[in-house]
């Protein structure tokens, strides 16, 4: 991490401005004011952002700041800032730097003693988490997983026993493969949620155990379109047999003699009132120990 330089009072400010992820009504009045008043807007895609600016009647000049030029072109923006100009940084949608460009520019600005000002707003991962019904007091954001299955599984294995809620971004053309790998690594019973096209017309938030969520996406090609956020419940230590009543264990063991583990756990839960996922974990650990 680059240590921030002494604040340069003669320099302008770099405003890190969140923009809508779908619904244009989500932009804040403060964001619009800043975008109108700054001397320059550093945008991930100037053509995309030009349409947004046109919609709101903003005539501020745009300059490209994306992953391919950010390291080299950052000095251009720093020069303007040091000359006293205010600059806004935006991405195509949501909050800059969150799986989007901007990190190198912000780092350079702070190193040069330039005031960096966050202008909060839309963020897909926070929006999804707020509506997921999964623990939100502690969570980790893993961004986009590797494109190939081997790399993806390796990353998933590294967080398999992470107790905090897991949040991932995924591209629509890889969402099914992603869920298949999650099911293979985390197990089909792990609770998860797919948040797709947040704030847009076809917004979908579907919460199911991973096996059922994978089947849901597999059966409906419409669920393989649009921007995706996947949330997965954190790992919890397997329950011991002591945590399950002796009657529930008796029923479970009888059913395991006649049917597969998943079905036995589900039926035993219906009969005894115990939680299905607890019975499933107990049976799984029991089989591993045999």
Where are each of the predicted segments found?
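Glycine/small-residue-rich loop that forms an oxyanion/phosphate-binding "nest" at active or ligand-binding sites
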Residues: 74-123, 127
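Generic beta-sheet signal
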Residues: 13-17, 83-91, 139, 164-168, ...
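A contiguous loop/helix-start segment that scaffolds small-molecule binding in enzyme catalytic cores
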Residues: 11, 86, 165, 172-290
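Class I SAM-dependent methyltransferase SAM-binding "motif I" and its flanking Rossmann-like core
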Residues: 104-162
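Conserved helicase motor
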Residues: 64-71, 145-148
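General beta-strand structural signal in soluble alpha/beta enzymes
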Residues: 43, 118-121, 168, 194
């Amino acid at each position: 991490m680059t240590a921030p330089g002494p604040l340069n009072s003669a320099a302008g400010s770099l405003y890190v401005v969140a923009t809508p992820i779908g619904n244009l009504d989500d932009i804040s009045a403060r964001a619009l004011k800043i975008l109108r008043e700054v001397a320059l807007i550093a945008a991930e895609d100037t053509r995309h952002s030009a349409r947004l600016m046109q919609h709101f009647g903003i005539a501020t000049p745009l300059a490209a700041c994306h992953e391919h030029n950010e390291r080299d072109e950052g000095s251009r923006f720093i020069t303007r800032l040091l000359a006293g100009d205010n600059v806004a940084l935006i991405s195509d949608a949501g909050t800059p730097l969150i799986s989007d460009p901007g990190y190198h520019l912000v780092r350079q600005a702070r190193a040069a003693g330039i005031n960096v000002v966050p202008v909060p707003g839309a963020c897909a991962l926070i929006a999804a988490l707020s509506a997921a019904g999964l623990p939100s007091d502690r969570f980790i954001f893993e961004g986009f997983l590797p494109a190939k299955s081997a790399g993806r599984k390796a990353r998933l294995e590294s967080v398999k026993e992470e107790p905090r809620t897991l949040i991932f971004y995924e591209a629509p053309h890889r969402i099914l493969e992603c869920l298949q790998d999650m099911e293979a690594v985390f197990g089909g019973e792990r609770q998860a949620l797919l948040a797709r096209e947040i704030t847009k017309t076809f917004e979908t938030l579907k919460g199911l155990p991973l096996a059922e969520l994978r089947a849901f996406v597999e059966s409906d090609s419409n669920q393989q379109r649009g921007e995706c956020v996947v949330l997965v419940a954190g790992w919890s230590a397997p329950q011991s047999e002591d945590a399950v009543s002796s009657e529930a264990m008796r029923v479970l063991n009888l059913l395991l003699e006649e049917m597969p583990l998943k079905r036995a756990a589900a039926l035993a839960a219906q009969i005894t009132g115990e939680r299905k996922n607890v019975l499933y974990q107990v049976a799984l650990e029991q089989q591993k120990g045999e």
